[in-house]
Amino acid sequence: MSSSECSVKPVIANRDDWLSLGQETTPKTWVQWVFIAFAVVFAFWHVATNLLINESALWQNAIHFAGFAVLASVIFPARLFGRQSLAFDLTFGLMVAWAACWVIASESRIYADTLSVTGQSWQFSLWDWFAGGLLIVAAIDFSRRVSGWVIPALIIFSVCYILFLGESLPGVFRTASLPLDDVLFRTIFNDEGLFGILATISSSNITLFMIFGGFLVISGASDFVIELSKVVAGRVRGGAAFVAVLSSALTGTISGSAVANTASTGVITIPLMKSSGFRGRFAAGVEAAASTGGQLMPPIMGAGAFVMASYTSIPYSTIVAVSVIPALLYFLSVAFVVRIEAVKHRVGEGIDMTVSRTKIIAGALTFVIPLSVMIYFLMSGVTPSFAASAAIAVLILVSWIAWLIGQWTGTEDLQTNVMNLKRIIDACLLGMRGGILTAVLMVSIGVINNAIVTSGIGNGFSLMIAQWSQGSLVIAILLIGLASLVLGMGLPVTAAYIILAILCAPALAGILSDTIIIEKLIHGLTDPAQAAMFMLVDSPHAAKVMVGMTLEEAASLLSSMPFEVAMTARPMLIEAETLMGFLLAAPLLFLWLSQDTNVT
């Protein structure tokens, strides 16, 4: 083996450093420099596309997937027969990028050719079939590379389900089969397909927040949250574990990823917890549990907030606002367990956690100010992409202001995290690295989403839950929780949420709203405007709407309402204050449980 081959092999064996300028002693090859340049340009393309360029969703989403296909092909090698091949990975990634561009160029021609002939079949050329098939294969392969075999298996089953398998299944799972050309068209071009609404969420919102998170990390956000957590919680009983919980909560505001959260805070907090007296397994468990909470922590929420906003048409700012209490409840519950463990094993009151005041100030400038700017814009109703872009610009500006202040006062801590060109490039690369998994999964799940919507199995699944629960909210939640548990064993949080939202949300929303409405009917709490809706129902119990009725009468009245009337009545009968009451009840219970006198 030649010396040149020996020098290249270690670089290819660990390709994570391909998306970082870093401090490597091994010089980068020209291929790596081209790859880095492409990733940086691709990051700026996302900013420009969402702020300056107005193109169709198909165009934007296809280019989005094409670029991340190239990045994923290199960072996540195929490992054919246990070996890596850079040539194969790059070739496959470039072929997928070509296929995505071919779809963009062929869309108008496909529509025109189909309209010019009689019949219902889509007019695909041989290259159309090849490009479409390659995109589906890419969705299967890239999702396998980044998350394992569960999602690829679901994609394969979804395609087979609407192609031929659905007509042979019994009950609510039975559906008519579709011809191959129809399956290909719906998978590629439909709003629920590969380049549909889920891909739009990824290309328009999530990727920009990933880039913003990269800027925060490079500017020293991880160090800041650790230092701040030490100041706030470091000197109480079990303080090291509370530092882990608080730092993970703060890091969750910018990462939304359990893996990234653990990697950035766990290397510090786990040794800290072990040295203060916690068992090693417990320390690792606290860090894992606290880091997982990043999926619940606004404003990013592991892409969940963007998916909710798109599916429900509720403003993103509203979803973020109402998510604060459940997120705090989650971290409060983890802290509650930490408190019990600290008392049980007599962990000390804390350890020496001396921090530098200037480090706290420097971190606050580049963490709190940009994050506050982003939250302000989100609450103002602007698009999430604009809010993230504005926060990036403010972060760069603030870092230079801090550097100037440091130069003037001679404070070294204020000068260390200035966002110069090298740091900006590294921030873009880190954002692109973090965005690979989300982008690949959001696009790939479009195949599953298309099969669910096309076949109508979502309605059948919701009907099945409603029948099994017999209108009981508790049973319905247990069934959905069981489904969530099973999906969570093999799917990332965002993927599991999307599938559950499509399959189970209609049933849960219907049972919850019916429970609240029946309660109001029993006690006669409907106002005249709401009561007028029930006067449209041909039922002997309609006259009792204002005065109250029995449980059986209320259930009979509600079940006799036509579907269209029920859909109109539900939003009128359920006030926001009622839902907020449900949200506030659980935290009060946990606050009560957190008192030592109530658990000992």
Locations of regions flagged by a protein language model:
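Membrane-water interface regions at transmembrane-helix termini and the short interhelical loops
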Residues: 49-53, 75-84, 133-149, 310-317, ...
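Long, contiguous bundles of hydrophobic transmembrane helices that form the permeation core
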Residues: 2-35, 321-434
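Core transmembrane alpha-helical segments of multi-pass membrane transporters/permeases
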Residues: 141, 146, 156-158, 165, ...
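Hydrophobic packing positions in regular secondary-structure scaffolds
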Residues: 509, 514-600
